[in-house]
Design a protein with these regions (language model features):
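A short acidic/basic microdomain associated with nuclease active sites
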Residues: 1-12
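Structural motif
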Residues: 13, 26-28, 72, 85
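Domain-level recognition of nuclease-like catalytic cores that cleave nucleotide substrates
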Residues: 64-95
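Active-site donor-binding loop signature of nucleotide-sugar glycosyltransferases
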Residues: 9, 31-33, 90
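Mg2+/Mn2+-dependent nuclease catalytic core
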Residues: 35-60, 64
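A generic beta-sheet turn/junction motif
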Residues: 11-13, 22-24, 81
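Conserved catalytic cores of phosphodiester-cleaving nucleases, focusing on short active-site segments
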Residues: 16-38, 54
Length: 95
């Protein structure tokens, strides 16, 4: 089970929708919703630039919360459309 550490975490670098822990892994979770695909698939919104921002924000969080420094990190995405909800674990790797 996940334990929510923070929601809508923000710092001067950026924002992360949800930070949660499960066992020895810290999950930095981006949530993207699209009512329809006119503006693209929700996963497409988590492009390389967005991934970099999430990663840098996660490093800021870890620097502020050193208790989690020994945790593994997973950068996850929840992609929501009218038809489905997809949880993609470790959607992108370390920059």
């Amino acid at each position: 089970n996940f334990k929510i550490i923070a929601s809508n975490y923000s710092c001067k670098i950026g924002e992360i929708d949800v930070i949660a822990s499960k066992e020895d892994t810290l999950h930095f979770i981006e949530i993207k919703y699209r009512k329809n695909l006119m503006y693209g698939n929700p996963l497409e919104a988590v492009n390389y630039r967005k991934q970099q921002k999430i990663y840098k924000t996660a490093m800021w969080f870890l620097n502020e919360n050193q208790i989690f420094m020994d945790f593994q990190c997973s950068f996850d995405v929840i992609a929501i459309t009218e038809e489905q909800i997809r949880y993609i674990y470790n959607c992108f790797g370390v920059m």
